[in-house]
Amino acid sequence: MNEQGEAINNSAESRIQLESSWKAHVGNWLLRPEMRDLSAFLRARKVAGVSVYPPGSQIFAAFEATPFQRVKAVILGQDPYHGQGQAHGLCFSVRPGMPLPPSLLNIYKELEEDLGLLRPDHGCLLPWAKRGVLLLNAVLTVEDGRAGAHQGKGWEGFTDHVVDTLNREREGLVFMLWGSYAQAKGKVIDTRRHLVLKAAHPSPLSAHRGFLGCRHFSLCNQYLSQHGLGMVDWSLPPCIALDGAILNGRIAV
């Protein structure tokens, strides 16, 4: 079985490669028939010689980096970057050494304007994830050079369930919804229990329509401080200070 298919193989619950706290809360969803179909689809694409990103061991990296009870904030993306070597399981993030995508450049621009934090020399957002920011794409796999290739194949139901579970079982979280796609996915969120921050997508095509200047990073910390969860440290270390395992392309927590 190829790596992508193995990551969601549902022949036995014990084989699901999902961080233990998340497995307890949402793992049963991966046993559903539609997820079995998704696993078969991923295997078939691999057999056909198609490059699927991220590698199977990193499909669930967002959950590995941010266990269920450690989540403070959620940033929702759409699907992984579709260039070779970019995606590593965290939305908007790229592996160290990869060029910064335009949307991430705008995220860094807003971060500097909002909090005075200078742009780092890399695009790896794993430090945010390890500090409680769930960097969740709606679709967890993509094909080389084909943005959106795996939309409608089954991932959306699983990630909808993740968002709904956080909404119901946690309280006082911050959901940062950038763009209409993320905002539609976040409609289930109870704004009496959580803070929902909405803005345009950070893409260069839309960032000037409300993302730049949204101050979501400081608003997030203000809310978290008021609700006793502790603020997020949004700073990112220089590339040279990142964990060696990260530099080698492996999510380490």
From Swiss-Prot:
Keywords: Cytoplasm, DNA damage, DNA repair, Hydrolase. It is found in: Cytoplasm. Gene3D superfamilies: Uracil-DNA glycosylase-like domain. GO terms for cellular component: cytoplasm. Its EC number is 3.2.2.27. One of its GO terms (biological process) is base-excision repair, AP site formation via deaminated base removal. It catalyses: Hydrolyzes single-stranded DNA or mismatched double-stranded DNA and polynucleotides, releasing free uracil. InterPro entries: UDG_fam1 (IPR002043), Ura-DNA_Glyclase_AS (IPR018085), Uracil-DNA_glycosylase-like (IPR005122), Uracil-DNA_glycosylase-like_sf (IPR036895). It comes from the Bacteria. This is Uracil-DNA glycosylase. The lineage of its organism: Bacteria, Pseudomonadati, Pseudomonadota, Gammaproteobacteria, Lysobacterales.
